[in-house]
From Swiss-Prot:
One of its GO terms (cellular component) is cytosol. It holds the Pfam family Lyase_1. GO terms for molecular function: argininosuccinate lyase activity. Its EC number is 4.3.2.1. Disulfide bonds: none annotated. It is found in: Cytoplasm. InterPro entries: Arg_succ_lyase_C, Argininosuccinate_lyase, Fumarase/histidase_N, Fumarate_lyase_CS, Fumarate_lyase_fam, Fumarate_lyase_N, L-Aspartase-like. The lineage of its organism: Bacteria, Pseudomonadati, Pseudomonadota, Gammaproteobacteria, Pseudomonadales. The keyword Amino-acid biosynthesis applies. The gene is argH. This is Argininosuccinate lyase. It comes from the Bacteria. CDD domains: Argininosuccinate_lyase. Its main location: cytoplasm.
Length: 464
């Protein structure tokens, strides 16, 4: 039987080349080449460790390290020839290394498999991505604090069911988003801890017979811990799923914020104005100024939710250890990280530039009987049970709807028709300022509480 040499580095067992379509179908280099820097970083650490344990000579290590550094320079200069027939980022770099330094390049993979190599690359890459995303969250939170401080006294309607509920300050509303982003930050920090565990040394699935010292590569690569089981090390993608879950929550928060910004910029609300640089126009309607940034972020949240669902579905049927299915982990992970990072960047740039229309907000807060709860609380302080007060104020509101008057616009005689406990001091309660100032406790909407919350927020950010 004649044997035709295969076209792969693993071709010894095979008698014919991989089908051309199959080679393209199974190749991942088009998307995993973005891991090149982390792949080279891992390879340099691996070669350094192999030299320390005597598997490589110092001269071989130096040749490998120098060759890898030159390859990185080629890639970053745009002169590297990525080949689909070499499947992935790992084999492209290894083949080029062998071209550059000869047979020594073939020794780099000693004691290592692409299974633990790619698991290491992804963790190194995601670790850096999380750091970048955390910095963007902090930048957005700083912008929210600055705007909240400037608008601590600006009164707007607070909503439930998108109906006017109670007056709040715009600063207080903005700080709600600060709190949500704080939880996102904490989740990603926690995720970072589990990302930062080293699988390198797990080899294909069972470890290696070479006298490796994983502590060396762990220290060189800055991992916090070494993975304790080689089977789990090569097959675990929990960290990617966890990141996409945290990213989904963050994008959900940005999507909710986006929805409010879209509403607030509309002609029906007109609460805020976004600078032109964050908006676009219409190809047919000359008057249009569309809030495309928040609209697009709202839409992009679905991509990240899809990445989470995709990874969960990808992993749910896999037996131990590594399976080719896991090649499909990268594109959703990459896309989720890119989408979250860019969405945060867009918001961090845009939020400090928001221009509130204070008088429009205030006028909106005056409508819809927003101080009705304050009137009920006033009657409670007069000694009436809250449920009775609730009913009394409900009757007053109905009268206001029928007569076209807000509670604060009614005369004392009109108000006393509903309870003789109402005196002239009620009008201090029914003002917008009286309503927000009365909620003077930690987490409340009173302007001084908003300023205190801003101070606490800045202290928190300074400690990061």
């Amino acid at each position: 039987m004649s044997v035709e040499k295969t076209n792969q580095s693993w071709g010894g067992r095979f008698s014919e080349p991989v089908d051309a379509f199959v080679a393209r179908f199974t190749a991942s280099v088009d998307f995993d080449k973005r891991l090149y820097r982390h792949d080279i970083m891992g390879s340099i650490a691996h070669a350094t460790m192999l030299a320390k344990v005597g598997v490589l000579s110092d001269a071989e290590r130096d040749a490998i390290v120098d060759g890898l550094q030159q390859i990185q320079a080629e890639i970053e200069a745009g002169s590297f020839d990525w080949r689909v027939d070499l499947e992935d980022v790992h084999m492209n770099i290894e083949a080029r290394l062998t071209d550059r330094i000869g047979v020594t390049g073939k020794k780099l993979h000693t004691g290592r498999s692409r299974n633990d190599q790619v698991a290491t690359d992804i963790r190194l890459w995601l670790r850096d991505e999380i750091d970048t995303i955390l910095a963007e969250i902090t930048r957005l939170q700083q912008g929210l604090l600055g705007l909240a401080e400037a608008e601590a006294d600006t009164i707007m309607p607070g909503f439930t069911h998108l109906q006017t509920a109670q007056p709040v300050t715009f600063g207080h509303h903005l700080l709600a988003w600060f709190e949500m982003l704080g939880r996102d930050y904490e989740r990603l920090v926690d995720c970072h801890r589990r990302v930062n565990r080293m699988p390198l040394g797990s080899a294909a699935l069972a470890g290696t017979t070479y006298p490796i010292q994983r502590e060396i590569t762990c220290q060189l690569l800055g991992f916090e811990a070494i993975g304790g089981n080689s089977l789990d090390g090569v097959s675990d993608r929990d960290f990617a799923i966890e990141f996409c879950a945290a990213a989904s929550l963050a994008m959900m928060h940005l999507s909710r914020f986006s929805e409010e910004l879209v509403l607030w910029t509309s002609a029906q609300f007109q609460f805020i104005d976004l600078p032109d640089r964050f908006c676009t126009g219409s190809s047919i309607m000359p008057q249009k100024k569309n809030p495309d940034v928040p609209e697009l972020v709202r839409g992009k949240s679905g991509r990240v939710f899809g990445a989470l669902t995709g990874l969960l579905t990808l992993m749910k049927g896999q037996p131990l250890a590594y399976n080719k299915d896991n090649q499909e982990d990268k594109e959703p992970l990459f896309d989720a990280a890119d989408t979250l990072r860019d969405s945060l960047r867009a918001f961090a740039d845009m939020v400090p530039a928001i221009r509130p229309r204070r008088e429009v907000m205030r006028e909106a807060a005056r409508r819809g009987f927003s101080t009705a709860t304050d009137l009920a609380d006033y009657l409670v302080r007069k000694g009436l049970p809250f449920r009775d007060c609730h009913e009394i104020v409900g009757h007053a509101v109905k009268y206001g709807v029928d007569s076209g008057k807000d509670l604060a616009e009614m005369s004392l005689d009109e108000l006393r028709r509903f309870s003789e406990q109402i005196d002239a001091d009620v009008f201090a309660v029914l003002t917008l300022e009286g309503s927000v100032n009365a909620r003077d406790h930690i987490g409340g909407t009173a302007p001084n509480q908003v300023r205190a919350a801003v101070a606490r927020g800045r202290q928190l950010l300074a400690q990061r």
